[in-house]
Amino acid sequence: MTATIVRPLRGRMEVRGLRGPRGDEPSNRSMFKTATGKAIRPTWVDAPEGAPRWQGYWVIAREHLTDVAEAIAIRDGQVEIEMHYSATEQCDRRCRSAEGDECTCSCEGKYHGNNHHASWIDVGETTLVRSAGSKTVTRTLTRHQAQEDRDARLEEWIRQLRE
């Protein structure tokens, strides 16, 4: 079973289907804390009464999406990430010039932080609009891609320290 991270439009993320540690691996809580390097407060939500324990899940602050997803993919081989996007399909100029990975608009993160205009139409000072329905997108992050992404961020961080 592949673990799934569900990132709703608002609120904390759910990490479902995450296997327990094997051998000398740290607990899942410790893995989250190590991955984020921050004060993270993962909360375990028990499975409904009578259901198997594996139907329980972790709840984590959404700002830890990248770090937690990479840690799970590196340990388990891959993780699926279910991301929910706004039903109003509005993409904001602030999205295109943003830093970080928090995007809930209808661009599905494609234009987040890269100032890409695509087929968006300017409406007012900051809002861009395109018509369509609501979206849920599931992406898979593999161990190889997670390690490459983590290494690239580390190299960029080191480069910035040297400047």
Question: Where are the regions a protein language model picked out?
Answer:
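Accessory DNA-engaging acidic/polar modules
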Residues: 1-163
